[in-house]
Swiss-Prot record:
Its main location: cytoplasm. It comes from Pelotomaculum thermopropionicum (strain DSM 13744 / JCM 10971 / SI). It is an enzyme of class 5 (isomerase). GO terms for biological process: protoporphyrinogen IX biosynthetic process. Its cofactor is pyridoxal 5'-phosphate. Homodimer. Pfam families: Aminotran_3. This is Glutamate-1-semialdehyde 2,1-aminomutase. Its EC number is 5.4.3.8. NCBIfam families: hemL, PRK00062.1. Belongs to the class-III pyridoxal-phosphate-dependent aminotransferase family. HemL subfamily. It catalyses: (S)-4-amino-5-oxopentanoate = 5-aminolevulinate.
Length: 434
C-alpha cells in the first residue's frame, strides 16, 4: 500500500543544500514528471524500496546495468571475495582485467582488443579521439536524439539544412567544440549520403546507438545499419557503435550480433560493470594498437579496470553466458509489452510501443516513432500522469518520456501481472489528463 513520500521529500530538501539540484544526474530530479525524486533505500531482485517503506517493481534497473536484478548472489559474492581477498584499487594491472577483457573479445566478434575505462562518456570520448588519430581526419557524425555522454563535442543538437553542423546544447560548450560535429537524422540513410557527398573526405567516424535508447527506444530501420557500414567503408571513415546500453543486453554479442553488422569500434558500459562504474572501447587490432602505450593516441585513467567493477562485470557475464538467458529476457519483455498494449487498448490511450529485446518504451503519441522528430510528438503531460499513477501503485518507471524501460532476469510472471493491473489504472489517468 502506498505510504506517501514524506521521507523522500525531507531527504531531497537536505540534498538540495549540498548537491546542485539535489541529485547527481539531472533526470533523477523527476522534474519532467512534476514530482520530487524518490530516495531509494535498498534493492532486491526486481524490486526497490524507498525511505518511506514503499515497494516498487523496478523497470529502471539503474538505467540498464542491472540485467540480473538487484543484489544478484553471483555479483554480491564476487564483490565480497574481491573486498576480502584482493582490494579496491591499485593503479596497476590485475589478472581480473585480463579475464574481463578476454570475455568481451570472445563475446563480440568485431572486438579484437579492448581498453577498460570508467564510464560510457569516457568510452565514447576515447573511441572518437582514436578514430580521429587513426584516420587523420577531424569531423565526426552523430545522430539527432542519440546520446553518447557529456563530452563537449557530443552535447550537440542539430542545426538547419541538409548538412547540420552542431550547435551546443549547454552553456559552457565553446562553439569551436561543436564545429567538428555534424548531426544527421537517425534512420535517414539518404540524408547521411548527402552529408558524405559534401564532407566525406573529412569525416573520421560515424557514431551511432544501433538501437537508440536515449530518446525512448527507437530500433534501426531495415537496412539502416547495413547502409552505415557500407557508406563509412566507401569513404574510409570508421563506424562506431555506442553499445553502452545495448551491449550484452540485446544479445551476448550486443546489437551487432542481433543485427549482423560489424562496426570498426564499439563502446561498452553499464552491463559489463554489473552495477559498478565502468566503460570500455574496443575494435580491430590495427586500430586499437594506436592507443597509448602501444601507439600515439593518448588515454588514461586512475581507476580504469579497478578490481571491484571488473569482478562484478565478470560475474554478470558468467550468468549471461548460460544457455537460455536471452530467450528468458525476450519472453518476459514480450509479455510485458503485450500486457501494456492490452491495457492501453482497454482505456483508449493513444500509445506507440517500441521494443528491442529487453528494452522498451511507451510513447504517448499516435505516430510511428522512428526518429527524434517523431519521438518529440509524444504528449509528455500524459506520460507524466501515467508515471505518477504507476509510481503510486508500486511500479517504478523512468521519470522521463524519453528513456527506456528495462527488463531483468529477476522480473517474472508476478511482476508482469502486477504491472499490467497498475497500467490499466495509469493509462486511464493519462487519458483523463487535460
Amino acid at each position: 500500500m502506498y505510504k506517501g513520500f514524506d521521507r523522500s521529500v525531507s531527504l531531497y530538501r537536505q540534498a538540495c543544500k549540498v548537491i546542485p539540484g539535489g541529485v547527481n544526474s539531472p533526470v533523477r530530479a523527476f522534474k519532467a514528471v512534476g514530482l520530487n525524486p524518490v530516495f531509494v533505500k535498498k534493492g532486491e531482485g526486481a524490486r526497490i524500496y524507498d525511505f518511506d517503506d514503499n515497494e516498487y517493481i523496478d523497470y529502471v534497473c539503474s538505467w540498464g546495468p542491472l540485467i540480473l536484478g538487484h543484489r544478484h548472489p553471483r555479483v554480491v559474492g564476487a564483490l565480497e571475495r574481491c573486498l576480502n581477498e584482493v582490494g579496491t584499487s591499485f593503479g596497476a594491472p590485475t589478472e581480473l582485467e585480463n579475464i574481463l577483457a578476454e570475455m568481451i573479445v570472445e563475446a563480440v566478434p568485431s572486438i579484437e582488443m579492448v581498453r577498460l575505462v570508467n564510464s560510457g562518456t569516457e568510452a565514447a570520448m576515447s573511441a572518437l579521439r582514436l578514430a580521429r588519430g587513426y584516420t587523420g581526419r577531424n569531423k565526426i557524425v552523430k545522430f539527432e536524439g542519440c546520446y553518447h555522454g557529456h563530452a563537449d563535442f557530443l552535447l550537440i543538437k542539430a542545426g538547419s539544412g541538409a548538412l547540420t553542423f552542431g550547435v551546443p546544447t549547454s552553456p559552457g560548450i565553446p562553439a569551436a567544440a561543436a564545429a567538428g560535429t555534424i548531426v544527421a537524422r537517425y534512420n535517414d540513410l539518404a540524408g547521411l549520403e548527402e552529408i558524405f557527398k559534401l564532407e566525406g573526405e573529412d569525416i573520421a567516424a560515424v557514431i551511432v546507438e544501433p538501437v537508440a535508447g536515449n530518446m525512448g527506444v527507437v530500433p534501426p530501420a531495415p537496412g539502416f545499419l547495413e547502409g552505415l557500414r557500407n557508406l563509412t567503408a566507401r569513404y574510409g571513415s570508421l563506424l562506431i557503435f555506442d553499445e553502452v546500453i545495448t551491449g550484452f543486453r540485446l544479445a551476448y554479442g550486443g546489437a551487432q550480433e542481433l543485427y549482423g553488422v560489424a562496426p570498426d569500434l564499439t563502446c561498452l558500459g553499464k552491463v559489463i560493470g554489473g552495477g559498478l562504474p565502468v566503460g570500455a572501447y574496443g575494435g580491430r587490432r590495427e586500430i586499437m594498437e594506436q592507443v597509448a602505450p602501444s601507439g600515439p593516441v593518448y588515454q588514461a585513467g586512475t581507476l580504469s579496470g579497478n578490481p571491484l567493477a571488473v569482478s562484478a562485470g565478470i560475474a554478470t557475464l558468467e550468468v549471461l553466458k548460460q544457455p537460455g538467458v536471452y530467450g528468458r529476457l525476450e519472453q518476459t519483455a514480450a509479455a510485458l509489452e503485450d500486457a501494456l498494449k492490452q491495457a492501453a487498448r482497454q482505456t483508449g490511450a493513444e500509445v506507440c510501443f517500441n521494443r528491442a529485446g529487453s528494452m522498451l518504451c511507451a510513447f504517448f503519441t499516435g505516430e510511428e516513432v522512428k526518429d527524434y522528430a517523431s519521438a518529440c510528438t509524444s504528449d509528455t503531460a500524459r506520460y507524466a500522469a501515467f508515471f505518477r499513477s504507476m509510481l503510486e501503485q508500486g511500479v517504478y518507471l523512468a521519470p522521463s518520456q524519453f528513456e527506456a524501460a528495462f527488463v531483468s532476469l529477476a522480473h517474472g510472471k508476478e511482476e508482469i501481472e502486477r504491472t499490467a493491473e497498475a497500467a490499466r489504472h495509469a493509462f486511464k489517468a493519462a487519458v483523463e489528463q487535460k
